[in-house]
């Protein structure tokens, strides 16, 4: 369905939220953002994004889904580390890509702490300015990498994976491992970020519904 895909996304035109400005009991309604069957639209019109203190989440069909985007930040103290289930599935995905002949490295970029993201973002701002940096880098507290559920795939050449056939493989097969390609071409307005063929987000069983 489009429900979680839209909930996970962020509109670049809105100002980022702050954890201080939202109470721990606040719930926000997110309207359905994509088309589907009438029955789907009737049952999936809205999702409640709930402040859990250090992060925001939405209840999916199967499990709680941590939400991290330009609307919903995480506390600087939120430090879950790399999710072991997500990592295990990522390694399976990488192995499958390698077996299919893609030059994918065993190395990847996974969990990043608030402090690490602060350094990265500031480096990008110093290099390109804040407006440009905001197109391709999350501000500290707003990066999916801080959830421990996001991973950037790297090729054997050391570069992020952008090759067209590899990107298509991910679109076709990532959901088999519980992942979605988060930042798609043509969805920059919705996500607030440039397309990233290499960036995967683990959502478990929800992935196949999102990809459908």
List where the protein language model places each region.
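Extracytoplasmic cell-surface/polysaccharide-interacting catalytic and binding patches
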Residues: 11-212
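Sec-dependent bacterial lipoprotein signal peptides
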Residues: 1-9
């Amino acid at each position: 369905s489009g429900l979680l895909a839209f909930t996970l996304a962020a509109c670049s035109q809105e100002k980022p939220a702050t954890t201080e400005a939202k109470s721990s009991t606040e719930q926000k309604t997110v309207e359905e953002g994509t088309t589907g069957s009438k029955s789907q639209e009737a049952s999936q019109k809205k999702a409640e994004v709930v402040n859990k203190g250090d992060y925001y989440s939405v209840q999916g069909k199967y499990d709680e889904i941590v939400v991290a985007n330009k609307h919903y930040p995480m506390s600087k103290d939120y430090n879950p580390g790399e999710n072991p289930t997500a990592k295990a599935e990522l390694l399976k995905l990488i192995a499958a890509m390698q077996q299919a002949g893609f030059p994918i490295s065993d190395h990847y970029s996974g969990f990043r702490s608030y402090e690490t993201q602060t350094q990265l973002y500031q480096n990008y701002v110093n290099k390109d300015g804040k407006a440009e940096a905001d197109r391709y880098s999350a501000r500290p507290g707003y990066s999916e990498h801080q959830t421990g559920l996001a991973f950037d795939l790297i090729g054997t050449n050391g570069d992020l994976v952008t090759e067209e056939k590899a990107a298509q493989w991910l679109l076709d097969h990532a959901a088999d491992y519980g992942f979605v390609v988060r930042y798609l071409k043509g969805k920059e307005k919705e996500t607030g970020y440039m397309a990233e063929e290499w960036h995967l987000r683990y959502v478990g069983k929800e992935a196949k519904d999102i990809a459908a």
